[in-house]
Amino acid sequence: MIFDAIQEWFQELLIDGIISNLTGMFDTLNTKVGEIAGEVGMTPSAWTRGIFNMVRSLSETVIVPIASIVLTFVMCYELIQLIIEKNNLHDFDTWIFFKWIFKTFCAVLIVTNTWNIVMAVFDVAQNVVSQSAGVIISDAGIDISGVTADLETQLADWSIGALLGLWFQSIFVGLCTQILSICIFLVIYGRMIEVYLVTSIGPIPFATMVNREWGNTGQNYLRSLLALGFQAFLIMICVGIYAVLVEGISLSGDNISGAIWGCMGYTVLLCFTLFKTGSLAKSLFGAH
């Protein structure tokens, strides 16, 4: 009699522990995946206003003067090229000075409006992400609250050994889930920090844009901006694929162990694809 009471108490303890572990695990996953859609859809100005103002101030007060020096050198080099390219001054036309003045005007216009150009790129990317959010499944999580009662009833028929094994599995997978949630955090926040770092030095590569030989620096910088902006769209696609995959997971008593490992497998796959979005976006836009 006492043994049966102890066994029943231990069984209830294991069931409560399993339900608690599963609820915490799936809630953590749902929260982190939900944060992805919210974070990547923000522009640099909306993500953290304090960091945005600091980066903009540094760019305008420190980087723009350096970009002015680079621009002066580049345009002097451009003028020399325009003069000597016509048969070593034997075929000299005065119109090249108008061409040089026009190029200089364009270069100065680009450098002085670098911040507007950079923010426009991310505004376009943010608009794409916002539109895609209406198409991609927004509920990228598993609702365990609706099956908790049925799950407890089904687990009540399990033996102590089976419950103990499932309890250890839920603890291990829960720890792995915490690690994976940190990986998701690193991808999302790492991308935003990279955005701020890249935007802060924008005037310098833009200062080389109009020169034929040095222009590749500015063009590659612009491609890098596009890659960073549209990386958010690729991240949204990853979240959409993850949502479709986890939607098919069945949380039943007979399949609860497979559901736990399946969910962790899909989360590992999500983390892997999130880490790949940066290099994929750069390869698509030809940035290096």
What are the language-model segments listed below?
Residues 79-92, 181-185, 213-214:
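Membrane-water interface regions at transmembrane-helix termini and the short interhelical loops
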Residues 1-70, 86-95, 105-176, 215, ...:
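Gly/Ser-rich, low-complexity
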Residues 65-77, 195:
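Hydrophobic alpha-helical transmembrane segments
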Residues 76-83, 202-212:
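Hydrophobic transmembrane alpha-helices of secondary-active transporters
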Residues 100-103:
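Elongated alpha-helical scaffolds
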Residues 73, 118, 122-125, 183-186, ...:
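Membrane-embedded alpha-helices of multi-pass transport/permease systems
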Residues 173, 177-209, 223-245:
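Alpha-helical transmembrane segments of helical membrane proteins, especially in multi-pass transport
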